[in-house]
Regions:
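A short, polar/charged loop-to-alpha-helix boundary motif
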Residues: 93-95, 138
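Glycine/threonine-rich flexible loop motifs
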Residues: 139-143
Length: 218
């Protein structure tokens, strides 16, 4: 089942962030309507009970569309909600520990920002690596991010991570997503570009079309 799930890890990877004015479920529905193939719940300040309820409903929405639902940081919530997997940061549980909670069929991804972190993710058994920031980003995390890596840095990361797929993140917009696809990223992740859009469904659709443009259909 994990291989089948990984085969669907492609295209627009929409991240639902707690800083949006829209409700998480409204954003999930909009992203799916726009053609997102992967949705991540990144609700770091949500109480566990609230996150679980949102995850359960999000899983149901994603199943209808054939999309993947991943939970940020919380393999326990991901397992209880029957999500497709989890995305981990550098300071979260190691991939092996997350997989003990989730079981063998779930996807485990991890954020990376350097060659050393990519190598460590591969050695730890991650299923994919998130890499960035590719461009300057409007989204803020708890830890300071390294400087933008650019398309050249992304291309190097794709080569370094192989055979693991790479999810590019950081400042990616409709205008730049085709470059990201051509650099070899399996997915283009976005937070502010989608969550802050006046019409998130339309913006997601534009990004999905641009990702597969220029002969880069997947």
């Amino acid at each position: 089942m994990r291989a089948e799930r990984l085969s669907r890890l492609q295209g627009v990877y929409a991240i639902v962030d707690g800083g949006s004015t829209a409700t998480p479920l409204a954003l999930v529905a909009a992203f799916l309507e726009g053609g997102a193939r992967v949705v991540q719940l990144r609700l770091k300040d949500a109480p566990a009970g609230d996150l679980f309820r949102i995850a359960v409903e999000s899983v149901a929405l994603c199943r209808v569309r054939g999309a993947l639902l991943l939970v940020n940081d919380r393999p326990d919530v991901a397992r209880c909600a029957a999500a497709d997997g989890v995305h981990l940061g550098q300071d979260d549980l190691p991939p092996a520990a997350a997989r003990e909670i989730l079981g063998p069929d779930a996807i485990v991804g991890i954020s990376t920002h350097s060659d050393a972190e990519i190598d460590a993710a591969k050695a730890a058994g991650a299923d994919y690596v998130g890499f960035g920031p590719v461009f300057a980003t409007r989204s803020k995390g708890k830890s300071p991010l390294p400087p933008p890596q650019g398309i050249a840095g992304l291309r190097r990361a794709v080569e370094r991570a192989s055979p693991l797929p790479v999810v590019a993140i950081g400042g990616i917009t409709v205008a730049t997503v085709a470059e990201v696809a051509r650099a070899g990223a399996r997915c283009a992740a976005a937070i502010a570009e989608l969550c802050a859009a006046p019409d998130p469904a339309t913006r997601t659709r534009e990004m999905a079309r641009a990702f597969v443009g220029d002969g880069h259909a997947r």
